[in-house]
Structures are given as C-alpha cells and as structure tokens.
Regions:
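A short SAM/SAH-binding and catalytic strip from SAM-dependent methyltransferases
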Residues: 108-120
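A short glycine-rich, Lys/Arg-flanked "PGG" loop and its adjoining helix->strand segment in the class I
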Residues: 122-137
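A short acidic, Gly/Pro-enriched loop at the edge of an enzyme's catalytic core
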Residues: 97-109
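Class I SAM-dependent methyltransferase SAM/SAH-binding core
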Residues: 47, 51-98
Length: 299
C-alpha cells in the first residue's frame, strides 16, 4: 500500500529529553492556556491524534472517553503507565493516514505538535474529518512558517526559503512548517469551519525563558494569543474548528474499521481480524496495534 512516509518515535525518550529535561516548561504552559480557551466544557468521546506519552491527555477533563492514538507503541506504553487502565482511556497504535475507525465516531479531536510531521497534511486532515461526527470540535495546532523569526531571517538572507509563499517547508526530514493561508484552505476544502485562532509561543527564546519566570511569560503569551484572529506571526498556531454539519454519525457501538480495506471490525481482543481482507490486528499490553507496516523488530 502506497503511503507517505511516517515519522516514528518508536523507542524514543522524547517525553523525558524534550519536555521534562529540555527546558520546555514555557511551551507546555502556553499550550495549557490555549487548550483551556478552546476545549469544549464537555463531550463524549475525544480522539487525541499524536498523543505521544499522554502529556496533554489530563487536560481533556470534559470528555467522558479519550482514545489516544500514536504511531509509536513505546510512546503509548509510557502514556498507559502515566494514565493507567481506566475504561476512560483506549490506546491505539496506528498511522494517521490510515485511521482504524468507521466514519463519524468522535465528537471531538485534537492534533497538537503532530501535523508538522505530515508529509501529506491534506490527506491526514481528510482522515481526521472522516472520523468525526457532524459538528464535532477539532483543535488543530500547526507550526507556522510565517513567524517573525523566519521573516527576519529571510530578509537578512540567513534562510533560503520564503515565509510568504503557501508551500510547506521541510526544514529537516519529516518536519514541516505551514503557511496559515494553506491551512485555512485545506480546512475549508474539507468542510471545517474555523471558530477561533490563537497564536502561541510568541516568546520562545532562550534569553527570555532565562530572564522571566515560566508562569509570567506564559501569561504574557496568553494575552498575545488573542491577536490570532487578526494576524499569525508566532511559531505555533492553534485553531478551534467544527466539522461540517452534513456528515455521517457512526452507528451506536461501532468504532473500528480495517485500516487496509475499510471494512468494519468487531472489537474482539486479543485479536481483531478483518472478515474481508483477513488482516489481523493484535491487542497486547492494553494497546491496539493497527499499524499496517510497524517498525522492524516491533511486535
């Protein structure tokens, strides 16, 4: 099956090295502010795309159930260790380009620090849209190529690519920045309505993070975030969107579909087998594995 390349964090200590020991307390606090502003107060079933080790999951307290999805099984193992085996959580190892769900399952979704790994962002977003109920809330974060730093670097001739054209820029392999206009077009083409835009991490500079307390800097950022409805010049942008109202809602109790052929699957752990194409998907250690091409050496 032809698919865009997938960025895998399998075996990575990303949660520890980047978030816990990497000096990212400011960025984490900024994201917490944004989520508090954008999240619905309540919901039934949230899909967290690119959930990683579950850093943001406790912030989704308004939802009764949360499905954590990540390509990396080891990241999900860390999330399960952090969050436990509550019936509220379901852990799914899968590829966003081939989501293992029937149409219209979720009434909410988030994709934070994940789209920037998508070589085919419109295809990934189309898969998300397909999984959402009509009018579902979808919070999308993306890395903004038209930020102040990249604009200054471009005018000073310290970078070759323009922050003003709408094409994504791959600054290192499988790491992309996107233009706000491109994101708006893709979302509009899929029927999403953009309800609110917040700009985030305006003060992502080592000097400022050393000079000012995290809480103060994040509070300033939360004020600057309100300018997002007029302009987007920060390195990170959050959108609250709603899916189209004329979509499909899944039948009661239906959730899984074969990512290889789309046939509905019965939830029958420890193994889910597709009656149409005979693909089999194991459930081990509390994690459903729907990856069509898992990393070598990973069961």
């Amino acid at each position: 099956m032809t698919t865009p390349p997938v960025c895998s964090y399998e075996g990575s200590d990303y949660q520890t090295s980047f978030w816990e020991k990497g000096g990212r307390a400011y960025e984490d606090a900024c994201e917490a502010y944004a989520l508090r502003r954008l999240l619905p107060t309540q919901g039934e079933h949230l899909l967290e795309l690119g959930a990683g080790a579950g850093r943001n999951t406790p912030r989704y307290h308004g939802y009764k159930r949360i499905t954590l999805l990540d390509y990396s099984r080891t990241q999900l193992e860390q999330a399960r260790e952090r969050l436990g085996d509550s019936p509220r959580y379901r852990y799914i190892a899968a590829d966003i380009y081939h989501l293992p769900f029937v149409e219209g399952v979720f009434d909410g979704a988030t994709m934070i620090r994940t789209l920037h790994h998508m070589a085919d962002a419109p295809l990934a977003l189309a898969q998300v849209e397909r999984s959402l109920q009509p009018g579902a809330a979808f919070i999308l974060e993306y890395a903004n190529k038209r930020n102040i730093k990249s604009i200054l670097r471009y005018f000073l001739r310290k970078q070759s690519w323009s922050p003003f054209n709408c094409e994504p820029v791959e600054y290192i392999p499988l790491n992309f920045d996107f233009h706000p206009a491109a994101i708006r077009k893709w979302m509009g083409d899929l029927g999403f309505s953009i309800i609110r835009t917040l700009t985030v991490s305006h003060f992502r500079m080592g000097l400022l993070k050393r000079l000012f307390p995290v809480r103060f800097l994040a509070w300033l950022d939360s004020l600057a975030a309100l300018t997002g409805k007029w302009w987007q010049l920060s390195p990170s942008v959050f959108l609250l969107t709603h899916s189209k109202l004329d979509g499909i809602s899944a039948p009661e109790g239906a959730i899984f579909a074969c990512p290889a052929c789309g046939n509905p699957l019965e939830d029958t752990p420890p193994l889910l087998r597709c009656s149409r194409c005979q693909h089999a998907y194991p459930v081990q250690g509390g994690i459903y594995d729907f990856r069509l091409d898992p990393p070598a050496g990973v069961n």
